[in-house]
Amino acid sequence: SSDLPPEADGKRFGDFEMDTIVGGNNQGAILTIVERSTNMLFMKKLKFGKDAEELAKAAIQLLSPYKGNIKTVTTDNGCEFYAHKAIAKGLDSTVYFADPYSSWQKGAIENANGLIRQYIPKSSPIKKINDTDIDAIMNKINNRPRKKLDFSTPFEMFSSYLL
């Protein structure tokens, strides 16, 4: 079970959700991470697809600038997350697993992945997408005003916690 502490309900800052987006015919993958309360999205292309060690390194690289602010990371039980201990240690935080078939336990990342799919359809080969494209998509999504945030952007909200 997820055993996520009740205070990680999406209202406090510092609870993250993590997932992967896979290209058509399993061609390549992108690591996606979202901070729950602000919807701030982090993305990184994984050269070797769903490789657990590469994924752990990518997660640590993306989030290490915010190390002191990371309370929890929730992911699913996919085999690519088997290096979760390395992620927990590298980010000085706790990794939780959502229960199988309970995507609502990580609604923020499911929502973000839906937004990403507007730019990267399921059929598209992720191998052909470069890091510049990924950064551009990430910036577009993070600078899109959200109703949930009273029409502030994820970037504005996330930044306000780091001041």
Labelled PLM ranges:
Residues G10, G14, S123-S124:
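Glycine-centered loop/turn motifs
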Residues F13-G23:
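Two-metal-ion RNase H-like nuclease active-site motif
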Residues I21, N26-F42:
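Short conserved beta-strand segments at catalytic cores or DNA/RNA-binding microdomains
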Residues M40, K67-N69, T74, T94, ...:
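Polytopic alpha-helical membrane proteins, predominantly small-molecule transporters/carriers
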Residues S64, A88-V95, D99-L163:
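Charged alpha-helix within mobile-element recombinases
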Residues G68-A83, Y101:
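Acidic/histidine-rich, metal-coordinating catalytic segments
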